[in-house]
Amino acid sequence: MKKANAWSLALIPCLGLWLGAAPVWGATAPPLSEVRVFKVESARCTETIPERAQSTQMCTHRGPTKVSVMEVGLGNNPMGRFNGAELNGQRTPVCQVGSISEACSGAGTLMGYIYVFDLNVQAQGWFEYSNTSINGPRNTLKTLLNIR
């Protein structure tokens, strides 16, 4: 019989602490099923973006601009870009609590994320967001929006 290595034994409590600190959502992770831009905010205006829209319509966005993306399901490779340049985004988990979707606060089932990306828009350009599902069918979803 092979003796256990001290290093491998030391990993067990570390893994237990790591797993114990992870949130328990109580359900299988839903596959990524939708990504879309739902809001663009700048000093000139805030506009709600309808489904399947290809461009902003209400105003010409310039300067500091926030782009909000809704992601239904869970992915593991979120990527936001404006005119090809990678962006950093803030994400907020969204949970289903009964029939209501809300920011997670320890109750409900994790159903996706809201990402907010900060841009500095100098001229019209394309915002792109993509992510790949963490489980079957491991599909990659993408949304594009022309920001005028």
Per-region residue spans from a language model:
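Surface-exposed coil/turn segments at beta-strand junctions on protein surfaces, enriched
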Residues: 60-62, 108-110, 120-124
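Extended low-complexity, serine/threonine- and proline-enriched intrinsically disordered segments
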Residues: 71-99
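Bacterial N-terminal signal peptides
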Residues: 10-20
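Short, compositionally biased P/S/T/A/G/V-rich stretches that sit at domain boundaries
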Residues: 24-62
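Aromatic sugar-binding surface patches on proteins
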Residues: 100-117
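Short, exposed beta-strand-loop hairpins at the edges of beta-sheets
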Residues: 116-147
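Bacterial N-terminal signal peptides that target proteins for export
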Residues: 1-11
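Aromatic/hydrophobic beta-strand junction motif of beta-rich domains
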Residues: 57, 61-75
